[in-house]
Regions:
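Extended, non-catalytic subsegments within catalytic or DNA/protein-binding/adaptor domains
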Residues: 1-251
């Protein structure tokens, strides 16, 4: 006990080295998308990890996401037929937002059906009964979390018959979403000692940067990068460049 107190005292004075973290890689995302979940919890965990990684999201942003934030065929319904079966995920508020509130991440349609994140997210909503509520009023909230629709990655518990169902309080905490990430990585045999929820954003930005996605696009999609005055005035004439972050994963 005396030794433990001494170590804690020295730690408070000298500080502690920040634990090394590794980013979630493209190969891990591919393995998770191909993974056949044994139950609804595994399905949720793998989709949360893939979505956060491709969207370069923080655990807190995943915790705040509701089912109505995921909009299927959003660009297609705007009159752009090339984007059929694609989707947009709205993050209402991101850290250090400048000149706009929130981001719209894009997820394209994969050439390999097993790697189609959009289809799997829709299937999970059907199985978990988390489709957006008909009474959804998110468009009236202007950047606030919808209180009517279920969370995109809800807490689950076992119902009377032993089946996984929505928890009475289904909204997850950031720590809960982080636990989903590490649980998903363990499913594909990853030692999670150097992983946590923040590793999704770290990995997504790494994959995108290595693929040559410009910083301006990363700024528009993830809020990452130093602010440059010109970016505030950019108004893209079509959403194609906003799919670059998703394309970096070659799904």
């Amino acid at each position: 006990m005396a030794y433990s107190r001494l170590v804690r005292s020295l730690g408070s004075l000298l500080g502690r080295q920040h634990p090394h973290k590794m980013g979630v890689t493209r190969d891990m995302v591919v393995a998770l998308l191909r993974y056949k979940p044994k139950n609804l919890v595994e399905f949720r965990n793998k989709l949360a990890t893939c979505t956060l990684c491709i969207g370069c999201m923080r655990p807190g942003e995943g915790a705040q996401a509701t089912s109505c934030n995921l909009q299927f065929d959003s660009d297609f319904l705007k009159g752009l037929p090339a984007y059929k079966d694609c989707s947009s995920l709205v993050v209402n508020k991101r850290k250090q937002d400048q000149e706009r509130k929130g981001h719209w991440m894009r997820f394209g349609k994969s050439t390999d059906p097993e790697l189609d994140l959009n289809f799997q997210l829709g299937l999970f909503m059907d199985l978990a009964l988390t489709r957006p509520s008909p009474a959804c009023a998110a468009h009236q909230l202007r950047g606030k979390r919808c209180l009517t629709c279920p969370p995109l990655f809800p807490k689950l518990h076992k119902g009377p018959g032993g089946a996984w169902t929505l928890h009475p309080d289904p909204v997850p905490s950031p720590a809960c979403v982080s636990a989903m990430v590490t649980a998903a990585l363990r499913m594909i045999g990853v030692d999670t000692a150097a992983f946590s929820g923040v590793c999704c954003r770290m990995g997504g930005l790494t994959v995108a940067t290595e693929a040559g996605v410009p910083e301006t696009i990363l700024w528009m999609q993830s809020g990452h990068a130093q602010d440059r005055a010109a970016r505030r005035y950019v108004r893209l004439t079509n959403p194609d460049r906003l799919y670059d972050t998703w394309r970096a994963f070659r799904l």
